[in-house]
């Protein structure tokens, strides 16, 4: 006797479909010599429509993890985490294979970071955090990751000095150069570098909070008695603050 699948969340499917459609439009603008400005990534300062697509994917992943959590609790121990590790390793491997194909035949210049690698690492960390922590702990971890990321960007721990936030002269690119050497997208760093994992995991955890909220999983004892704080939590979960 088969168990009926839980109903799908239409809002999540709609956001996922819209994000995929937006990705296709951004990656295929029709004429690369004359691209509509919002469909181009910001060179450095500011943000464009194109810059929101990858975070949207990460947010959706967090929502999906929260919705899948009740079903995932049916398995415990290594089998539960084996699926997480397998999916993460598969994503990372796919990203490396694609990068190798682009670098072929000179594999000495292969790019190590990438979009799929970032998604794989983010999924691995977020899925384990969602599986092993409470909602309150996930809020704390998400906030702490943002604070750590901000601190690392402004801390004078490298040759550029404090608050060096120019292309090729900031902590994120300094870390990438130390970790990857020449195996990056550009000599000055990589947009899918190591420090960005912190903000990606934080975004996914905000997505998990949104998923829990949408599923109505918050019990009465965990809800704030302060209307203002409760509203702030809802806005953050919906991605307005986060």
Spans of model-derived segments:
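N-terminal signal-anchor module of multipass membrane proteins
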Residues: 2-80
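Membrane-interface interhelical loops and short amphipathic "cap" helices
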Residues: 29-48, 101-113, 162-190
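Divalent metal-coordination and catalytic microenvironments
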Residues: 16, 62, 95, 118, ...
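A conserved active-site cap/scaffold subdomain adjacent to cofactor or substrate pockets
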Residues: 189-219, 226-242
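Long hydrophobic alpha-helical segments that form multi-pass transmembrane helix bundles
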Residues: 135-206
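Transmembrane alpha-helical segments and their boundary/interface "anchor" motifs
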Residues: 50-56, 71-149, 234-238
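Structural signal for the C-terminal ends of transmembrane alpha-helices
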Residues: 63-72, 101, 128-135, 208-220
């Amino acid at each position: 006797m088969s168990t009926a699948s839980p109903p799908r969340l239409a809002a999540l499917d709609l956001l996922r479909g819209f994000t995929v459609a937006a990705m296709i439009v951004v990656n295929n603008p029709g004429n690369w010599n004359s691209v509509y400005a919002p469909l181009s990534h910001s060179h450095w300062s500011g943000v464009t429509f194109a810059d929101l697509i990858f975070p949207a994917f990460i947010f959706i992943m967090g929502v999906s993890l929260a919705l899948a959590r009740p079903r995932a609790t049916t398995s415990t121990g290594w089998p539960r985490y084996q699926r997480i590790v397998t999916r993460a390793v598969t994503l990372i491997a796919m990203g490396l294979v694609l990068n190798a194909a682009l670098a072929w035949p000179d594999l000495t210049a292969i790019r190590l970071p990438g979009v799929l690698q970032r998604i794989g690492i983010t999924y691995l960390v977020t899925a384990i955090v969602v599986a092993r922590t409470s909602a309150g702990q996930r809020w704390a971890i998400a906030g702490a990751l943002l604070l750590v990321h901000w601190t690392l960007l402004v801390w004078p721990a490298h040759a550029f000095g404090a608050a060096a936030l120019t292309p090729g002269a900031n902590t994120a690119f300094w870390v990438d150069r130390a970790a990857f050497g020449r195996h990056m997208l550009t000599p000055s760093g990589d947009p899918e570098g190591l420090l960005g994992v912190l903000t990606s995991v934080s975004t996914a955890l905000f997505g998990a909070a949104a998923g829990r909220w949408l599923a109505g999983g918050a019990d009465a004892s965990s809800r704030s008695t302060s209307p203002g704080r409760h509203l702030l939590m809802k806005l953050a979960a919906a991605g307005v603050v986060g």
